[in-house]
Amino acid sequence: MAGRFENLPGGGAAVALDDVEISILRSLAVQLMELIGPGEEPAKDADPLAALFAEGPSKPPSDPALKRLFPDAYGDDSEELRAAASDFRRYTENDLRARKREDALVVVRALDALSADAAGEGGAVLKLTPDESRAWLGALNDLRLTIGTRLEVTDEEGEQLYRLPDSDPRKPMVMAYLWLGALQESLVETLMS
């Protein structure tokens, strides 16, 4: 099970993680939540229906990683499609941000509980329910997209990542990117089996 998710009876998934892996995953999930931002909290006396239909931003984010996490709905440069993308963003981005934040928070909470349970043991087996597994899958995907954007990874140079010299300053993030990819792939395989 080391480093690969496996099925749990009744659904869900499990993976063995050591203390370093737990620390890295937690740190990355917290950084992702910080990147996504805190979100808008409705006023205590606000109309719940109005809060449900609150409008979000209409312009794409300037940060390339956020732009990757929250892309335009339509990729064409025509004025009509830019306006449609703006409207789509206005009505969907807040909910999408909230879901991505919640997925990352599920990761942090699971790792915090795991760390508390395994104190002093050097690692533990993380067991996820089916719902937690889906949240983890979303968070792992968001982490890979973010790191891949920061590293400027393209399909064409994917193989080159495996051959970076140890002296390359990108090497630690590339290793995290590749490891997250392997975790994500094993979780997908587990959930589909």
What are these regions (language model features)?
Residues M1-A110, L114-L126, E132-S193:
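Charged, alpha-helix-forming regions
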